[in-house]
Amino acid sequence: MSNDPLGSYSKLQKGFSKDVLNENNRILIGECIRAALKDLKNKDRIDLRSLVPQKAYFAFLGKKKFSRAVNKSLFLENPKEWDDFSVALAKNQFQGFSIERITRIIYSAAISFCCYVDIHKEGDQKTPGTFFEYLIGHLFAWRLGVNPTTRLPVLNIDMETTLPTDFVFNLGKDKPKFHLPIKISTRERVIQVWAHQRVLDGVYGTGRFLGTPVILTETKTDKRKREVIEICLPDQWRIYQMHIAQLKRIYYLDVPVSYDKLNLVFPRLNVKSFGHFFFEFDSLTG
């Protein structure tokens, strides 16, 4: 077993884009997670002051800095949780796993690697985001049983060209296609998700592509005050859903408090923890 998360990550980078569905990706993802958790186990933790209702956060302490915020109620530090989930995923059989447990396992997988990078690499914002893309992209591909594409053909009178996209999964004739943006967080950039969905609807027809973004969290840490907040734009989201395009689901690993409330108002946005995906797949594609 590798003790170097970044070494396993480097191997993952080399093969991922060629075959997102490949089972070896999950093996390498597991190596990244186990090595990160092993390193973090020996790190001190500091409690952060949470300004988010009913949530508590801590950070891992490195030699010169501390990591991003970690949700105490979601974090699982035993790597066996990932190993057990990986076995279930290989069979696409999730008996014995609750929605909450799957969400916690995947949250812990993502946040552990991100925290490792936070305290060991200076100013590296790209690696955590790319790893999260690999993690969610592979899980989605395996659950759906198909590899994604990142370009789609666009035909018009004057030319034939392709449209660059987030991951798009085509399940075959007369079945829906999934449009999968993957983000560590969204902030004000979230309008890009709705805009991209609008383009897909305009080119291919409304309802052909199911917009299902997956997002890690919306937390922001004030390192000086050691405070955690969630940065959310619920009113803007409602406007985007009414006037730009319709997203089928918005999945989070750490569901923001104000976005969770959007399930209860008009226009309803289906904001759910990511564990739901593994149990509602059939209803989404039916």
List each language-model region with its residue ranges.
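Interdomain/boundary linker segments immediately adjacent to catalytic/signaling cores
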Residues: M1-H138, R143-L144
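Intrinsically disordered, low-complexity Ser/Thr/Pro/Gly-rich regulatory segments
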Residues: R151, D201, L284-T285
